[in-house]
């Protein structure tokens, strides 16, 4: 009831040999679970915070709504809010389990595309960002979707900066043989309830080994 409304930005400065020299800003957000406890007004605050980062790329790693079957708000309003996110070189997303459940599968991809996101479903996209060749690999949800790690990674190159989008973090074990430079995930909610120096009190399926990062 409290933590979803505590909006913080974690910044990580990383160096990769593939980067041509100009810094690249990538913003990831995930698990907004729009519904009774996280409203569209809360989502607007997330969008404002994202835009403050002046991102080159924005990545969403799934679970847009909490329960699509019970949501009585406007789907179009969510799309309109997400469309306000600015990214110089594009916005990309993958499915989470909540984006399949409750009937969300019927509209999630269309909603995200109308908001300017490209949804990656066991697929990839290669683009040039500030002189650096970046390949984005997006795996489908593994709990309810049609997850296929081998299909996702087709065509990967050691010469590119390779970014992976997955929803469930424990799936990373399926990608260890690939030259992934950065993996992004959601689903764990930081351990649901996390006690400092002790660890998570609650975990969820496919988010037990990698709870936070």
Predicted regions and their residues:
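N-terminal membrane-anchoring alpha-helices
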Residues: 1-18
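Membrane-embedded segments
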Residues: 5, 20-118
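Beta-strand-turn-beta hairpins that frame and shape the catalytic cleft
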Residues: 15-27, 117-118, 125-137, 157-159
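Active-site metal-binding loops of divalent metal-dependent hydrolases
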Residues: 30-34, 62-64, 97-98, 123-124, ...
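Short, flexible loop segments at the rims of nucleotide/cofactor-binding pockets, characterized by
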Residues: 34-39, 67-71, 139-144, 161-162, ...
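Short, Asp-centered acidic motifs that coordinate Mg2+ and/or phosphate
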Residues: 57, 92, 117-118, 134, ...
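Short beta-strand/loop segments at the ligand-binding rim of alpha/beta enzyme cores
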Residues: 152-164
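Conserved beta-sheet core of the metallophosphoesterase superfamily
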Residues: 169-213
């Amino acid at each position: 009831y409290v933590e979803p409304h505590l909006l913080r930005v974690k910044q990580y400065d990383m160096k990769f040999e593939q980067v041509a020299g100009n810094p690249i800003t990538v913003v990831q957000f995930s698990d907004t679970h729009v519904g009774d406890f996280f409203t569209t007004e809360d989502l607007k605050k997330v969008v404002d915070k994202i835009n403050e980062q002046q991102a080159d790329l924005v990545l969403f790693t799934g679970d847009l709504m909490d329960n699509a079957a019970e949501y009585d708000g406007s789907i179009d309003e969510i799309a309109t809010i997400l469309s306000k996110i600015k990214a110089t070189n594009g916005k990309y997303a993958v499915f989470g389990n909540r984006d399949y459940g409750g009937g969300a599968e019927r509209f999630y991809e269309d909603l995200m595309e109308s908001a300017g996101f490209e949804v990656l479903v066991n697929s990839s996209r290669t683009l040039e960002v500030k002189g650096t060749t970046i390949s984005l690999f997006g795996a489908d949800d593994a709990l309810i979707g049609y997850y296929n790690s081998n299909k996702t990674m087709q065509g990967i190159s050691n010469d590119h900066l390779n970014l992976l989008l997955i929803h469930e973090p424990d799936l990373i074990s399926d990608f260890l043989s690939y030259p992934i430079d950065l993996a992004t995930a959601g689903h764990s909610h930081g351990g649901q309830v996390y006690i400092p120096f002790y660890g998570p009190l609650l975990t969820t399926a496919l988010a037990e080994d990698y709870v936070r990062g």
